[in-house]
């Protein structure tokens, strides 16, 4: 028996010895990062990269994806033009790209913790000296997927994890020697060695100059130097500046846009709770032309690059005055409501709870549970206007015959990025001006319903809340983040980020697949299901100045933050995809409150995404966002409600009494001068604290 065991042991030893000898005979395949100092192409020296920018300028000099076939090369040029027309340099929200010089590397050969190595094989580091997170390591997700890069098989595509990158910061992507599994061996190229060398070259190139921050960092941290096999250095731009500059400009010129006419009481919309008054406002249109299918329609700019009204339109607006509440000395607190795509000015009164399936008039006929009456319960007046790209604009002012339902979606046409950005600017700027026009209004007794308790109606200049639904929520977010006069609170319902995903991931109909096939010649799901696809990066740069998440993220970390935030989301939203919901929440770096709906698929859950950027899920949140400059604390919370089975989750703010009660509590707290609390059902007095019944 012992002899048999000895024989078996010897056999196993010889077997392993034989394998090890064979392994030693396999030469590793060297892999290097493509670094061509003479090229301005995306895949020749990495993207984004500071060598593509002229010194002291934010714009870069290269196309996104040279060599792409028609029609993507046509779209690419439009997005590049949009980025350099309204953009502010490299977007903080984008995918990073670099190419290896071996064509046969598969995605399975990436070595990343925790599956492959105990140490980091790839990381992102902030190189901005003096920054709060200088030298801080950031985790990333990476792929070598060939989708979107058929001609270049080994393209490394990387997305930063956690909180968004910040504007005007220099970052480095560092890829280490053990990033690839055998038989491949990643190693620094001669060009990279020169770029990272402390020895100055005889002639300094743009590429060498762009790597200077990394050389300085490695000089202070020499332990990294030997292991770095690939690196990318770039500085994020300031895409939020463009819209902020335009907002500041229209505020300075707002007095010339305050002409209005009060037409009188709207008896059909008025109820025992609210008196509805209709008026018209002479509102500016800042676009040089409306979007015409594939024709771009941009902003009308003066010689200084600031918006100038192309024309003045007479548009409808409505005011809701509480019938039973006495007006406070300083005026009624004001809720400004912003409807969504194809919405009408009357939706603050007509959009309410639908009690049975199959109703098609849920946006046009007055219903209980509407914003006007919910706000009136807390003593708030409401103002709403006919927005650009709303139903009224489409039926009256659109530059071509079109139906009200299809007109607004022209503004989301992926083939016209200039229009996508300019349309968003128009909607934000008119909201900024509308607020100031409404503030100037005083209604006398003869202009009010006879049942109104007050003999006059005006509006408190220091208590403004803005609420938006769907696209309206995106506009509200951007307006709050760019306004010089803070809102006391904002309420975002059916909310998501503004960008390409509105078109490609429009949930109600399968429009994404149609656009993938028609515009991008891609297979269904090739783009919509793949955040690494270059089309997304193309849009993230081209549409960056209208990226609401970027505006909100800058705002929450700024001295200007002085506003409470409530976000109401629904499961299985038919209009806004989970991807766009999560992007907005990431921009806010917001905590989730309430009870997470049960039995959700992973794609619908918000909690995992919230945890990736360091926030929490609690039963109740209050005063959880601190302005580090002023020391003041504000409530920022999101609640996710289940759809009610009648309409999709896009409508929960109107369909569910619990959601209406939530924003009612929010308004009540603000009126009382308290910090609101956002909490689950069962929390006692959520307008004042977070005491909950377990």
Q: Over which residues does each language-model region extend?
A:
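Bacterial N-terminal signal peptides that target proteins for export
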Residues: 1-9
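N-terminal cap/lid segment of alpha/beta-hydrolase-fold proteins
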Residues: 263-330
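C-terminal subdomain of alpha/beta-hydrolase-fold enzymes, centered on the catalytic histidine
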Residues: 415, 419, 423-426, 485-489, ...
């Amino acid at each position: 028996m012992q002899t048999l065991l000895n024989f078996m042991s010897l056999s196993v030893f010889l077997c392993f010895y034989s394998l090890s000898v064979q392994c030693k005979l396999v030469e590793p395949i060297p892999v290097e990062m493509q670094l061509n100092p003479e090229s301005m192409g995306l895949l020749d020296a990495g993207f984004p990269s500071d060598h593509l920018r002229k010194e002291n300028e934010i714009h870069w000099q290269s196309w996104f994806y040279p060599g792409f076939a028609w029609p993507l090369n046509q779209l690419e040029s439009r997005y590049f033009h949009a980025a350099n027309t309204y953009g502010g340099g490299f977007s903080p929200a984008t995918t990073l790209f670099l190419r290896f010089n071996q064509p046969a590397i598969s995605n399975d050969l990436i070595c990343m913790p925790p599956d492959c190595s105990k140490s980091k094989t790839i990381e992102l580091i902030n190189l901005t000296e003096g920054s709060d997170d200088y030298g801080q390591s950031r985790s990333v997700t990476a792929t070598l997927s060939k989708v979107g890069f058929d001609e270049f098989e080994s393209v490394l595509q990387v997305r930063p994890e956690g909180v968004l990158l910040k504007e005007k910061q220099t970052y480095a992507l560092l890829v280490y020697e053990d990033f690839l599994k055998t038989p491949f061996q990643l190693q620094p190229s001669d060009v990279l060695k020169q770029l990272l060398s402390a020895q100055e070259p005889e002639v300094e190139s743009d590429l060498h100059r762009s790597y200077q921050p990394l050389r300085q960092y490695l000089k202070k941290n020499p332990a990294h130097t030997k292991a770095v096999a690939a690196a990318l250095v770039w500085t994020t731009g300031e895409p939020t500046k463009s819209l902020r500059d335009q907002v500041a400009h229209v505020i300075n010129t707002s007095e010339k846009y305050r002409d209005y006419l009060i037409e009188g009481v709207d008896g059909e919309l008025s109820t025992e709770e609210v008196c509805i008054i209709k008026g018209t406002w002479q509102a500016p249109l800042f676009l040089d032309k409306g979007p015409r299918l594939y024709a771009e329609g941009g902003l009308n700019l003066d010689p200084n690059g600031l918006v100038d009204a192309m024309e003045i339109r007479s548009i409808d607006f409505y005011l809701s005055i509480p019938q039973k509440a006495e007006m406070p000395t300083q005026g009624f607190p004001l809720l400004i409501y912003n409807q969504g795509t194809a919405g009408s000015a009357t939706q603050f009164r007509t959009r309410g709870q639908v009690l049975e399936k199959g109703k098609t008039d849920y946006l046009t006929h007055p219903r209980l549970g509407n914003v006007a009456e919910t706000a009136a319960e807390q003593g708030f007046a409401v103002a709403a206007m006919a927005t650009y790209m709303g139903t009224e604009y489409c039926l009256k002012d659109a530059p071509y015959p079109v139906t009200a339902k299809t007109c607004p979606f022209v503004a989301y046409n992926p083939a016209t990025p200039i229009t996508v950005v300019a349309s968003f600017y128009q909607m934000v700027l008119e909201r900024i001006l509308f607020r100031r026009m409404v503030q100037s209004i005083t209604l006398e007794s003869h202009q009010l319903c006879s049942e109104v308790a007050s003999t006059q109606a005006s509006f408190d200049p220091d208590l403004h809340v803005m609420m938006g639904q769907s696209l309206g929520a995106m506009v509200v977010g951007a307006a709050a983040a760019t306004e010089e006069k803070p809102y006391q609170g904002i309420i975002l319902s059916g909310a998501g980020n503004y960008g390409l995903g509105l078109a490609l991931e429009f949930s109600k109909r399968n429009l994404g697949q149609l656009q993938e096939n028609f515009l991008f010649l891609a297979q269904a799901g090739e783009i919509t299901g793949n955040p690494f696809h270059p089309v997304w990066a193309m849009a993230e740069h081209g549409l960056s100045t209208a990226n609401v998440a970027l505006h909100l993220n800058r705002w929450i970390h700024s001295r200007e933050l002085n506003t409470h935030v409530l976000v109401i989301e629904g499961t299985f939203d038919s209009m806004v995809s989970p991807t766009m919901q999560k992007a907005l929440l990431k921009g806010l770096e917001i905590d989730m409150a309430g009870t997470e709906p049960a039995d959700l698929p992973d794609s619908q859950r918000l909690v995992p995404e919230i945890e990736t950027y360091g926030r929490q899920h609690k039963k109740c949140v209050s005063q959880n966002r601190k302005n580090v400059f002023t020391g003041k604390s504000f409530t920022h919370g999101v609640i996710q409600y289940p759809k009610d089975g009648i309409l999709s989750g896009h409508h929960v703010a109107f369909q569910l009494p619990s959601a209406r009660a939530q924003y009612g509590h929010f308004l009540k707290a603000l009126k009382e001068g308290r910090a609101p609390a956002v909490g689950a059902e069962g929390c006692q007095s959520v307008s004042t604290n977070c005491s909950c019944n377990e």
